[in-house]
C-alpha cells in the first residue's frame, strides 16, 4: 500500500454524512489521503442524490460506519493524482461511475466485476467507504474506473450516466429487437430502462407508474403506453395485451415486495426474462408464485442485477450521449447551486413528490 502526504492548509472539509440512523448532516470530516499510487482524489463539481442514499439514511439495512460520507453519483475535478496514474491529470473533469470494481482481484477474470473478492465489492462508495458528498473523495484505480467528460456532453447528462443510465441499461441488456417489454417503475432507473429497451429495438414497451413528471419523459424515451398501478391490475393488463402469452422481458425498477411476484406472473413461459434492478429493503422474502412459475418448470429466467461500472462502460454511455442517441439530463427536475443544498435534495428524494425525478447540485467547488 502506498501513502502520499498532502500539503494542504486545512485537514478538515465539508461532507454530508450519516450521523446516525435516520439523520444525515453536513459535518467536518478529515480530508482523504491517497492510499495507492493508482488512485486519485477528486472534488465534486456536480452531484445527485439517489434513492439508495435515502435507503442508507432511513432504511433498515446493515450498520454503517460512523459518520459515513454519503453519495455515489458525481462528476468531479481531479485534484491529486497517484504517481502511477497514466491517463488523468489535475484539473481533468471526469464522470465517476457509481460502481468501482476491484480490478486487483482474480475474480475479475471470471467476469465478476461487481463482486470480485467480496460480495458487492464494487458497490462501496457512500455505502461502506466514504462517498462523493464531500469537498474531496478518493477513487481507486483511476485509469480503470474514471471517464473523461467529452466535449459537448453536459454536466447533467454525465451525472445521469454514472448510475441511472448504467443501471437502466443493464436491465435492457436482455431485450431483443421486437420484444414486448414491461418496465415496472418510472423513476430514474425505470426511465433509463425504457430508453435502453427502445435503443435495443424493443417493439411494444409498456411502462408502469404514476409519477406526473415521469410520464411525458417515458414517452420521449420510447414507451408505447404508460399505465398506472392505481387504475389497472397490471398482471391482467399485460396478459390481455399479449393474448395471454406474457411479456418477453419484465424489468423491475420500482414497486414493493409484491412486484417481484407480479413480474413472474406476467412474463412468458419458456423464454421470458425478469430482470430486477430494485433494492428490496428490510427482511422477509421475494416470493416466486408456484402457479406462474410452472411449479418450478416454466422456463422463465430471473436476473438480479446492479448497474455496471468501470471506465469502458462509462465511456460508452458518454459516447452515446455525445452522438445524440439519448438525453439523460431530461430526468433532472431540480437543480441547486451550492453544496449545502444536498440536505434539501435528500428530503426531496425521500418525499418523492409528483414533480420530482432527479436532482442535481452544482457544488460551486
Regions found by a protein language model. Name each.
Residues 35-36, 89, 176, 268-269, ...:
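Residue-level recognition of short, solvent-exposed, well-ordered loop/turn junctions
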Residues 102-184:
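NAD(P)H dinucleotide-binding glycine-rich loop of Rossmann-like/cofactor-binding domains
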Residues 1-75, 135-141, 147, 362-365:
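Short N-terminal strand-loop motif that marks the start
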Amino acid at each position: 500500500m502506498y501513502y502520499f502526504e498532502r500539503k494542504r492548509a486545512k485537514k478538515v472539509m465539508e461532507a454530508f454524512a450519516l450521523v446516525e440512523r435516520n439523520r444525515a448532516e453536513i459535518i467536518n470530516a478529515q480530508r482523504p489521503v491517497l492510499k495507492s499510487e493508482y488512485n486519485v482524489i477528486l472534488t465534486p463539481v456536480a452531484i445527485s442524490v439517489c434513492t439508495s442514499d435515502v435507503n442508507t439514511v432511513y432504511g433498515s439495512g446493515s450498520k454503517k460506519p460512523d459518520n459515513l460520507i454519503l453519495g455515489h453519483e458525481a462528476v468531479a475535478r481531479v485534484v491529486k493524482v497517484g504517481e502511477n496514474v497514466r491517463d488523468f491529470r489535475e484539473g481533468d473533469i471526469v464522470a465517476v461511475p457509481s460502481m468501482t470494481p476491484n480490478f486487483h482481484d482474480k475474480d475479475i477474470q471470471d467476469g465478476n466485476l461487481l463482486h470480485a473478492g467480496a460480495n458487492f465489492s464494487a458497490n462501496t462508495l457512500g455505502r461502506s467507504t466514504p462517498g462523493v458528498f464531500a469537498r474531496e473523495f478518493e477513487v481507486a484505480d483511476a485509469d480503470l474506473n474514471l471517464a473523461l467528460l467529452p466535449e459537448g456532453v453536459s454536466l447533467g447528462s454525465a451525472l445521469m450516466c454514472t448510475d441511472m443510465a448504467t443501471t437502466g441499461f443493464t436491465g435492457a441488456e436482455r431485450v431483443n429487437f421486437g420484444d414486448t417489454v414491461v418496465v415496472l417503475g418510472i423513476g430514474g432507473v425505470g426511465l433509463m430502462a425504457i430508453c435502453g429497451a427502445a435503443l435495443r429495438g424493443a417493439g411494444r414497451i409498456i411502462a408502469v407508474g404514476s409519477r406526473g413528471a415521469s410520464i411525458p419523459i417515458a414517452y420521449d424515451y420510447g414507451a408505447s403506453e404508460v399505465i398506472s398501478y392505481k387504475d389497472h391490475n397490471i398482471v391482467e393488463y399485460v396478459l390481455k395485451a399479449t393474448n395471454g402469452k406474457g411479456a418477453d422481458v419484465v424489468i423491475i425498477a420500482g414497486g414493493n415486495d409484491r412486484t417481484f411476484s407480479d413480474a413472474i406472473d406476467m412474463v412468458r413461459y419458456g423464454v421470458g426474462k425478469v430482470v430486477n434492478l430494485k433494492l428490496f429493503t428490510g427482511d422477509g422474502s421475494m416470493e416466486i408464485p408456484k402457479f406462474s412459475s410452472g411449479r418450478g418448470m416454466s422456463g422463465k429466467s430471473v436476473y438480479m442485477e446492479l448497474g455496471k461500472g468501470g471506465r469502458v462502460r462509462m465511456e460508452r454511455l458518454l459516447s452515446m450521449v455525445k452522438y445524440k442517441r439519448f438525453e439523460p439530463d431530461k430526468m433532472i427536475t431540480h437543480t441547486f447551486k451550492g453544496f449545502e443544498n444536498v440536505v434539501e435534495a435528500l428530503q426531496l428524494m425521500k418525499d418523492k413528490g409528483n414533480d420530482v425525478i432527479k436532482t442535481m447540485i452544482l457544488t460551486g467547488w
